[in-house]
């Protein structure tokens, strides 16, 4: 009887907090959360999508709405009651994946790189700085002072509760170092290597009628890095396939790092050199899958299969495809992500790393592609830079996917795969968007000395 009374009491409490006025962004059940996220992404009726196409491209394009749906160029979802709903970003994505609409032939990722893009790459390639072994070119570098902010507007569903907040922190790598927390709005706990997602955790009680503000200020030094193709080919060695390290980074991690051995071997043919295999896969992806605005990652069952099926993908989706293909070929690869900090282009970004025996970890930005239409557009090193190099405009906080946050989160994460915006929850549920806002603010950048590493 006591159990029945307790259950009734808990039900009453839940009803008081989670009544009819509960905002859609307050998530208590994982399955319902994913369903609501799908509804949020697929929010346009066919007629609304047609109207949006007319606004963007004119009546002649809008008249072909059903044709674009049939071709898979407008992503749709059929609801349980039989209604066809269109992905909210699909109309704006159309010009990115359909040259007939844009009027511009798409060539490959990176083909449209401009002089400022090339200048960033050349500054790394031409840097006189190198490691002790003279093949890891590290430089230029910069020290970045930044502020990360999370603001949670007041809502009655939060009343009397405590907000738990996780924010990204730069992770120490061969390219990121001298990381420090300068100040914070609340006492904090750092994950300190206990998760693939590097975080700072804070909590604070909700004050009735008032927004809750969290922030911290930090600084770190980040360097660019480049390994020439000649150095890789001259130093590469066979993998020790019995080593635990090798197993760790060639193992599949379903549902988003999966066996694509058939597809990968079709790309590489008879090539046996791991670097040249990597280069063939990189070019294949860069040449075939244009960038397009993404759905919430948490609603996609298998990221690399999504790219193969849809014919396009954002930075994280093509990176996952690349990592899956590398591991399927027995080449160690891993995820890295956070933010890109290029002048005038502060945004979330995902990339990868590949491991070559005799060299070590080499950064790979699949989304940036090969600069210029052909290697001769600029030069070979500039053309293929991002297949074995990276710039200094990075804030990397993740070296893996789908990890457990520290301290552990109780409810479903807003970002179930990656970790860039942060996470917020209470004792009663997860806060999804737009229940809170976060931002990364760059306070100051200064040229920095480059740390030297004898090996990785």
What kind of region is each of these model predictions?
Residues 4-12:
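Sec-dependent N-terminal signal peptides
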Residues 12-18:
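C-terminal segment of classical bacterial N-terminal signal peptides
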Residues 31-226:
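Intrinsically disordered, low-complexity N-terminal segments that are enriched in acidic
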Residues 18, 23, 31, 192-199, ...:
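Acidic low-complexity segments
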Residues 171-173, 220-226, 291, 358-360, ...:
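Short loop/turn segments at secondary-structure transitions that flank enzyme active sites
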Residues 340, 344-456:
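Active-site rim recognition segments
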Residues 269-351, 355-357, 372-375, 379-387:
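Active-site neighborhood of thiol-dependent amide/isopeptide-bond enzymes
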Residues 180-184, 230-239, 366-369:
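Short intrinsically disordered coil segments
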């Amino acid at each position: 009887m006591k159990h029945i009374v307790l259950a009734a009491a808990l039900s009453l409490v839940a009803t008081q907090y989670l009544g009819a006025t509960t905002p859609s962004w307050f998530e208590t059940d994982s399955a319902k959360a994913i369903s609501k996220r799908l509804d949020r992404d697929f929010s346009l009726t066919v007629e609304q999508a047609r109207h949006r196409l007319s606004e963007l491209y004119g009546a002649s394009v809008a008249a072909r709405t059903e044709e674009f749906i049939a071709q898979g160029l407008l992503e749709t979802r059929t609801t349980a009651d039989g209604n066809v709903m269109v992905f909210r970003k699909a109309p704006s994505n159309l010009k990115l994946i359909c040259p007939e609409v844009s009027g511009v032939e798409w060539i490959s990722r990176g083909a449209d790189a401009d002089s400022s893009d090339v200048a960033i790459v050349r500054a790394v390639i031409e840097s006189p700085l190198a490691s002790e072994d003279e093949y890891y070119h590290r430089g230029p570098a910069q020290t970045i002072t930044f502020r990360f902010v999370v603001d949670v507007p007041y809502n009655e569903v939060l009343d009397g509760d405590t907000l738990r907040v996780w924010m990204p922190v730069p992770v120490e790598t061969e390219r990121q170092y001298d990381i420090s927390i300068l100040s914070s709005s609340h006492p904090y706990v750092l994950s300190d290597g206990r998760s693939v997602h590097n975080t700072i955790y804070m909590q604070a009680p909700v004050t009735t009628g008032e927004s809750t503000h969290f922030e911290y200020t930090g600084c770190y030094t980040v360097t660019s890095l480049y390994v020439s193709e000649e150095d890789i080919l001259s130093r590469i060695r066979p993998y020790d396939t019995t080593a635990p390290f090798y197993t760790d980074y060639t193992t599949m991690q379903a549902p988003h790092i999966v066996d694509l051995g058939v597809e990968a071997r079709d790309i590489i043919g008879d090539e046996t050199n791991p670097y040249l295999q990597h280069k063939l896969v990189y070019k294949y992806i860069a040449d075939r899958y244009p960038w397009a605005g993404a759905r919430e990652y948490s609603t996609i069952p298998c990221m690399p299969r999504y790219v193969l099926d849809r014919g396009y993908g954002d930075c994280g989706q093509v990176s996952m495809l690349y990592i899956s293909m590398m591991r399927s070929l027995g080449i160690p690869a891993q995820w890295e992500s956070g933010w890109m900090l290029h002048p005038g282009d502060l945004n979330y970004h995902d990339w990868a790393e590949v491991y070559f025996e005799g060299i070590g970890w080499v950064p790979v930005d699949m989304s940036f592609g090969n600069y210029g239409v052909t290697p001769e557009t600029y030069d070979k090193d500039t053309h293929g830079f991002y297949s074995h190099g990276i710039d200094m405009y990075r804030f990397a906080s993740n070296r893996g996917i789908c990890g457990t946050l520290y301290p552990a989160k109780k409810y479903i994460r807003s970002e179930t795969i990656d970790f860039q915006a942060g996470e917020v929850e209470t004792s009663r549920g997860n806060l999804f968007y737009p229940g809170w806002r976060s931002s990364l603010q760059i306070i100051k950048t200064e040229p920095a000395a480059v740390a030297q590493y004898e090996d990785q």
